[in-house]
């Protein structure tokens, strides 16, 4: 998918780029698959900020995506390719033979009129088809991967994302995840064949502050520009270094310090992610 650039008629437009939308075939047509979601803006149930630099962004409706792919044995046809304001990839509206309609994440190469299906096994290895991991050949690129059977996909859902099946071991399948981590996942978990579309999204340049605000991203203030009460790096006369190793606003080391907690599923990690 191409990236569109602009003539530098303003300083912001000089480097700004947007995704080409020629692949989008329709606006949302199934009202039952659109719901309102109240924006948390990074606040918890007490109204306190728990995730900084977030806001509601532009007004939008959430599209209900079929992450479980549990409609077995019924063939579906891709009716439309649509924009989703909540994610950086495109979504497809799939119309099934029994009249049901569901949204799925668009794999690269899937277009209007193509057929997709979900089953435990026995399907062709084509983009958009979903099967259990144990029944997909070694070396295949997959996305929309479940971590727990029946819970719904949690891994490789962003634009250009995929994991590769590296092998099998007892009831597990070994996957190389987008982060580079090698991990064992139960073979009965569902996954979709192919790579998530809109791969060029990573090359898009936001270009201006207002566009970030539309995306729900607030400005970040440097700790060294704050007062000592607000950040460990704050204070001093003029521009000074903090006099200590870089830390978070709460005093935890911020470069290279491991914060991941141990849990039972760590035993399924064969090799850790790349640095």
UniProtKB/Swiss-Prot annotation:
One of its GO terms (molecular function) is transferase activity. Residues 216-275 are annotated as: Disordered. The keyword ATP-binding does not apply. Residues 257-275 have a biased composition (Basic residues). Belongs to the universal ribosomal protein uL2 family. NCBIfam families: rplB_bact. This is Large ribosomal subunit protein uL2. It comes from Aliarcobacter butzleri (strain RM4018).
């Amino acid at each position: 998918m191409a990236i569109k650039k602009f003539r530098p008629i303003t300083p912001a437009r000089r480097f700004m780029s947007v995704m080409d939308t020629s692949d989008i075939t329709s606006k949302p047509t199934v009202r039952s698959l659109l719901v309102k979601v109240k924006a948390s803006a990074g606040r918890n149930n007490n109204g306190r900020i728990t995730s900084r630099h977030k806001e509601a962004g532009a007004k939008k409706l959430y599209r209900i995506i079929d992450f479980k792919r549990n409609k077995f044995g019924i063939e579906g046809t891709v009716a439309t390719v649509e924009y989703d304001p909540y994610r950086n990839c495109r979504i497809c509206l799939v119309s099934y033979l029994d009249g049901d309609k569901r949204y799925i994440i668009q794999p690269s190469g899937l277009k209007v009129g193509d057929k997709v299906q979900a089953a435990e096994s026995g399907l062709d290895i084509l983009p958009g088809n979903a099967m259990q991991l144990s029944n997909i050949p070694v070396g295949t690129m997959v996305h929309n991967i479940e971590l727990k059977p029946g819970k719904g996909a949690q891994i490789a859902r962003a634009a250009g994302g995929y994991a590769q099946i590296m092998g099998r071991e007892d009831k597990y399948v070994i996957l190389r995840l987008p982060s580079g981590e090698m991990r064992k996942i139960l073979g009965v978990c569902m996954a979709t064949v192919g790579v998530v579309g809109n791969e060029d999204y990573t090359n898009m340049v936001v270009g201006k502050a207002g566009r970030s605000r539309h995306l729900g991203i607030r400005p970040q203030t440097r700790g060294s520009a704050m007062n000592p009460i607000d950040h460990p790096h704050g204070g001093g006369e003029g521009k000074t270094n903090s006099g200590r190793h870089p830390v978070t606003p709460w005093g935890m080391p911020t470069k290279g310090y491991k914060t991941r907690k141990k849990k039972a599923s760590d035993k399924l990690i064969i090799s850790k992610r790349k640095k």
